[in-house]
């Protein structure tokens, strides 16, 4: 199985969640073994999508260095991971990825327009060899060996609109588009009002998030899935784990987790070489993990 990139450059413009200003986003083909590269065209600096370049995980995943950063990378990374794309360059002219509609479906549409191109080098994957878990109180994230990789996530909120939700998702590109990609980010009206008082979330609206006010959803069209909230958490996790640089061949399980716990999990996996094996995907591995590469 070969590494992939996109076949052509595609550009879109969307609103930044925090500043509320238009952001120009361009995805471009990239050569084999380069991975996912973010480029700040306004600053002329770039960052590779990898755990060591994560600089903040409060409310979003932020990558960068001393010269600059890009916030809210998890949704576009989720789409790229969902589509199994190994090498791509992402250009933005601001310090955040546009929020689009709050899900990853707009990025999926950009990838569909760009098309997927095979490269010469062999595709790589990370086989999870033993269980790795990160816990903080009752919250946890965990990966474990599995021949049919899935994401199993449980959330628990005191708000009755969300409550306790659990969803298990068997990873494949088709399942990603059908079951995960349209799930939007969500928040509470009181939190949005607080953030705006801090000059943040200026681009947030009912057009790009599910907003909850006490016991009701403010969006006129309601939810896209009955359990859209937990599905979006899986969307985020798929994006956060893509920072490992290759698809994970193993199960991911989470309870009340966060971007921060996901980041700590990626670091924990890489800390000990006994936790995983980086492999080139030959016919045997492709057959063993047939569902993920369907």
From Swiss-Prot:
Q: In which pathway does it act?
A: Glycolipid biosynthesis; lipid IV(A) biosynthesis; lipid IV(A) from (3R)-3-hydroxytetradecanoyl-[acyl-carrier-protein] and UDP-N-acetyl-alpha-D-glucosamine: step 2/6
Molecular function terms from GO: metal ion binding; UDP-3-O-acyl-N-acetylglucosamine deacetylase activity
Question: What is the required cofactor set for this protein?
Answer: Zn(2+)
Under SUPFAM superfamilies, the record lists: Ribosomal protein S5 domain 2-like
Does the keyword Nuclease feature in the UniProt annotation?
Answer: no
* GO BP term, example: lipid A biosynthetic process
List of residues binding Zn(2+) = 75, 232, 236
Q: Which reaction does it catalyse?
A: a UDP-3-O-[(3R)-3-hydroxyacyl]-N-acetyl-alpha-D-glucosamine + H2O = a UDP-3-O-[(3R)-3-hydroxyacyl]-alpha-D-glucosamine + acetate
What Gene Ontology cellular-component terms does the record carry?
A: membrane
**Which parts of the chain span the membrane according to its record?**
none
What functional role does this protein have?
Catalyzes the hydrolysis of UDP-3-O-myristoyl-N-acetylglucosamine to form UDP-3-O-myristoylglucosamine and acetate, the committed step in lipid A biosynthesis.
What does the similarity note say? Belongs to the LpxC family.
UniProt-recorded name of the protein: UDP-3-O-acyl-N-acetylglucosamine deacetylase
- Organism, per UniProt? Campylobacter hominis (strain ATCC BAA-381 / DSM 21671 / CCUG 45161 / LMG 19568 / NCTC 13146 / CH001A)
Identify the coding gene. Answer: lpxC
């Amino acid at each position: 199985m070969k590494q992939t990139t996109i076949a052509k450059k595609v550009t879109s413009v969307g609103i930044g969640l925090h500043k509320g200003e238009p952001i120009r986003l361009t995805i471009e083909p990239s050569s084999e073994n380069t991975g996912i590269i973010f480029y700040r065209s306004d600053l002329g600096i770039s960052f590779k999508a990898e755990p060591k370049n994560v600089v903040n995980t409060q409310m979003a995943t932020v990558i960068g260095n001393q010269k600059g950063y890009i916030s809210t990378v998890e949704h576009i990374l989720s789409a790229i991971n969902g589509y199994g794309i190994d090498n791509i360059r992402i250009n933005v002219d601001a310090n955040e990825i546009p929020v689009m509609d709050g899900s990853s479906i707009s990025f999926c549409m950009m990838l569909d327009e760009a098309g997927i191109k095979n490269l010469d080098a062999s595709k790589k994957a990370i086989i999870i060899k033993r269980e790795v878990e990160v816990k903080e109180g009752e919250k946890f994230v965990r990966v474990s060996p599995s021949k049919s990789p899935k994401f199993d996530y449980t959330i628990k909120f005191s708000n009755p609109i969300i409550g306790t939700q659990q969803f298990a998702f068997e990873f494949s590109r088709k399942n990603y588009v059908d079951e995960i990609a349209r799930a939007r980010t969500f928040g509470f009206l009181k939190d949005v009002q607080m953030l705006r008082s801090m000059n943040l979330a200026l681009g947030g609206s009912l057009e790009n998030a599910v907003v909850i006010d006490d016991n009701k959803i403010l969006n006129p069209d309601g939810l896209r899935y009955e359990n859209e909230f937990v599905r979006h958490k899986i969307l985020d996790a798929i994006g956060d784990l893509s920072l490992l640089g290759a698809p994970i061949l193993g199960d991911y399980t989470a309870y009340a987790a966060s971007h921060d716990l996901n980041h700590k999990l990626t670091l924990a996996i890489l800390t000990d070489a006994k936790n995983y094996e980086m492999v080139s995907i030959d016919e045997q591995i492709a057959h063993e993990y047939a569902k993920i590469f369907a």
